Amino acid sequence: MKRIIHICLWLLTGIFAEVSLSAQNPFIYHKGKTYKDVAAYRMEEIIDLNTHTPSTPILCEQQVPEHQSTLSYKVALPLYVRGIFFSRDSRPGDYQWPNNTNRLLPWMFNRLEDLTRSDYAGIPSNALPSASGDALLLELADGEYLFAKAIAGSNSLSWFQVNQDGTLTLYVSTLGEDALTGRLPLLIFRKSSSVYHVFSDAYDSLIAKKAVSALRKRADKEYFNAFDYLGWCTWEHYHYDIDETKILNDIDAIEASGIPVRYVLIDDGHIANKNRQLTSLVPDKKRFPNGWSRIMKRKQADKIRWIGLWYSLSGYWMGISAENDFPPEIRQVLHSYNGSLLPGTSTEKIETWYEYYVRTMKEYGFDFLKIDNQSFTLPLYMGGTQVIRQAKDCNLALEHQTHRMQMGLMNCMAQNVLNIDHTLYSSVTRASIDYKKYDENMAKSHLFQSYTNTLILGQTVWPDHDMFHSCDTVCGSLMARSKAISGGPVYLSDSPSEFIADNIRPLIDETGKIFRPAAPAIPTPESILTNPLQSGKAYRVFAPTGDEALSVICYNLNTSPAYREVESFVKQEDYLLRESTGKSADSSSDNILAFNWEKQSAEVLNASERKIKLSGFTDSLFHLCPIRKGWAVIGIQEKYLSPATVQILKRTTDKLILDVHCTGTLRIWADSHGKQELRSIPIKKAGRIEIKK
């Protein structure tokens, strides 16, 4: 009879399954290769997730079989109702796990085998689910939730595989030639009666275990100051086709537009390379004949104050070229492997490379970096030795050096375990696949992925919902509101001549500062375990805003014409969702006021739901504001996140004192002696205001 693993695994024996270190290594990475059913030493013991011990949520292998690089385990799951498997999509001939890029997607299922069906109703703008994934959320039959996630050890990485029969396998491997050794971390899992706490509890445990992560909670990190302001990025406007003249002309056009863009992000298209491998940290001399000097001279304290630059974690898309112009002391910290130069092999050499890399950008005058292609760094090392340790060291060295040099960092294509679990200082990571102008299905998928992934990513970083076009006639204003409630960076990619001010100005104050929520938006409970592109139902998200409000956006993301019109709602109980974000939801309020941002109307919510009709690809934004001592504070009505535009300094039964952060129309609800009114107060100058009943 097999012994069942509970929380600490004391594993004794296994069944050999066609793998040894002397055999050809199966982990050399190339485009189109998958790791489904990879050869592994099959352990007899079952990882049983039916039993939960909150004090020790990390499962570990204590006795690793000798001379094995890869182990596999059967995973026993509790009875469940439905779930989410987090993996990338699997496109034949394309890159596969662990190169998740920005494609970590939430795949909904009633039974795990649903994910293996060729007719799986997934996400219309993406391929079918990859069987190899990194995390799993289950709604259990007893009403609780279980979250399980793969983790990395000092030189090991685990992952899940969904099998054709609906069973689940856990693999753990060095992804290379060396053997697994020591106490081996396998996975982390937690159970909770709250779908929100199951994520936060898991990350509390993960952060506390330094052997498997280098993390801090999002709230404990410093947010880079440029990201508090409106930005502009070259990518969706130009893609690779950038040069010095175009950027200088666009800076002129931005300044002439009257829109207070405060930073410019220069995306891909500037890198000196050969066959997509980096040859120099000096930009392409044909496109940028003066280097960065002329562009840097355009920075001004009250206009475009910050300039950021795109780069790849591994040098360029396919690594670093042997034909490079680096100084000798830098060349010696690079080693040749599988057709590319890579930083390493020691931790010290990797740190030296990233010190040179980041310092060079700092000396050019850049204020922050967008570091892309992060999840492809691991595949570049795969099949060698010390694969996990070296790839992880790249992420950590980037964190160390940007922090040391006080440079901002935007992480992109950073959705595998090594990337996600090692954002020690950085506070921003892309949450989704690229946004594309005029593509309705991609926009719907983008919103669904961004909000759902924030349940994971949002524990340690602010989610970057990508750039957007204010001139997008399909969803420009809708996208603007989603950027506002995301809490992450907000940056345009229109041609400056096409800026739509009506979609942009509600995001910001007169200086370009963004009105941000107190925590990033995430799905409401009924929306977490459904696919809103296929469900026939509305999709809702929420975020705490201002001192005491909760903002809710209701969407119709359905792709079928049969669900062109759906019904949504807001209700009193929604306000209590503030507590799930770690913010107070004081129940001492008299009532909850619902402010409909589009209609600029308000009503007191009663015991029943407030129904909303959503026709086509649309959204509806509400602010739920508590009525206390006869007052409800909505904020400046012209701004998407109205409650974030004011600070409540004092409130009595007859007086309200506020600090108003921008000009516009201040909306206040007053209830005195049975008389209720929604007041409009013109604000000509930001600052302190006293209001009496």
Task: State where each predicted segment sits.
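Bacterial Sec-dependent N-terminal signal peptides
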Residues: 1-25
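N-terminal accessory beta-strand-rich subdomains and adjacent acidic, glycine-rich linkers
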Residues: 24-207
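Aromatic-lined carbohydrate-binding/catalytic grooves of carbohydrate-active enzymes
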Residues: 225-388
